[in-house]
Structure formats: C-alpha cells, structure tokens
C-alpha cells in the first residue's frame, strides 16, 4: 500500500496489463448515500471504467457500483457518470497530457481514506499485443522464481 492509502475496495488489474501507467493522481468521488454504502461493501467494478475531462471538470465513466440492497427508491443508476474531485491545477495538467496521442485516464483502484472514498487515476498509454505478452511472460517468470526460492528455502 502506498503512503496514506487506506483500505483497498477494488483494483483494476486489467488496466495494468493493457496500459503503460505514466503517472497517478488521487481523486475524491462524488457519491450518493446508497452508493457510498455499496462502495464500502466493495460492490464496485472498475474493469471497463475510464475518466474524462469535460468543461474543466473530471468525470468517471462506466464504473459499475451495484445498487445497495436496502436502498429501494434512493438507489442511483449503477452505471451513471460520477464527478471526480481534483484541484484545478491537476485538471489542467491532466488535460494537457491527454492532448498527446494515445493517452487516456483509467481508474486503478478505489479505497477508503479517512472515511472518504478515493480513486487512484492513472494517466496511461495503450500497450500493443506483444507488450502484453511480454508482461505476462515476465510475471510468470517471477512467479516461478518465487516458487523455486520457497521450495529451496524449505529444505
């Protein structure tokens, strides 16, 4: 866990495979009452989500927050667009970086920090298929090395 990071509720492992993460930014999320209850219960999916900047504001799109079971009529649309809380300086910096070709903003993880839901947004550039295969190959090699070291140290 990074410094100051709280309880991790959801991670986007697919984003680490599909993108080169250039930099990360922590942002707050504007949620309704029933949404925060679902988030605290870890009923959130980041897989297809992304962030975009419109009219000087940052928005989180396609992130699924399951309806709260006891929410009844107060449940919001699970796929609705949610506003991200960033400083103006951070938004302009990200907007300037997004002008580069192939750059996008992807949510990497959602966690609680001091009782507030935060999302770690990554400024990312898409990988080619051969880059993805290389990542998988490297991960498998590291796993095999750890397994062999564990077996070797058990003697």
UniProtKB/Swiss-Prot annotation:
It comes from the Bacteria. GO terms for cellular component: cytosol. The keyword tRNA-binding does not apply. Keywords: Cytoplasm, RNA-binding. Coiled coil: none annotated. GO terms for molecular function: RNA binding. It is found in: Cytoplasm. GO terms for biological process: trans-translation. SUPFAM superfamilies: Small protein B (SmpB). Belongs to the SmpB family. Required for rescue of stalled ribosomes mediated by trans-translation. Binds to transfer-messenger RNA (tmRNA), required for stable association of tmRNA with ribosomes. tmRNA and SmpB together mimic tRNA shape, replacing the anticodon stem-loop with SmpB. tmRNA is encoded by the ssrA gene; the 2 termini fold to resemble tRNA(Ala) and it encodes a 'tag peptide', a short internal open reading frame. During trans-translation Ala-aminoacylated tmRNA acts like a tRNA, entering the A-site of stalled ribosomes, displacing the stalled mRNA. This is SsrA-binding protein. It comes from Streptococcus pyogenes serotype M18 (strain MGAS8232). The lineage of its organism: Bacteria, Bacillati, Bacillota, Bacilli, Lactobacillales.
């Amino acid at each position: 866990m990074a410094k100051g990071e709280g309880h991790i509720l959801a991670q986007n492992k697919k984003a680490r495979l599909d993108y080169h993460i250039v930099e990360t930014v922590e942002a707050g999320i504007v949620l309704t009452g029933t949404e925060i209850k679902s988030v605290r219960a870890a009923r959130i999916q980041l897989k297809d989500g992304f962030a975009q900047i419109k009219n000087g504001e940052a928005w989180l799109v396609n992130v699924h927050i399951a309806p709260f079971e006891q929410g009844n009529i107060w449940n919001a649309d699970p796929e609705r667009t949610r506003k991200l809380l960033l400083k103006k300086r951070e938004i302009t910096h990200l907007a300037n970086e997004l002008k580069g070709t192939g750059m996008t903003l992807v949510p990497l993880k959602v966690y609680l920090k001091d009782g507030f839901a935060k999302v770690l947004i990554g400024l990312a550039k898409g990988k080619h298929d051969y880059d993805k295969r290389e990542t998988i190959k490297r991960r498998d090699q590291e796993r095999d090395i750890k397994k062999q070291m564990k077996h070797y140290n058990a003697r």
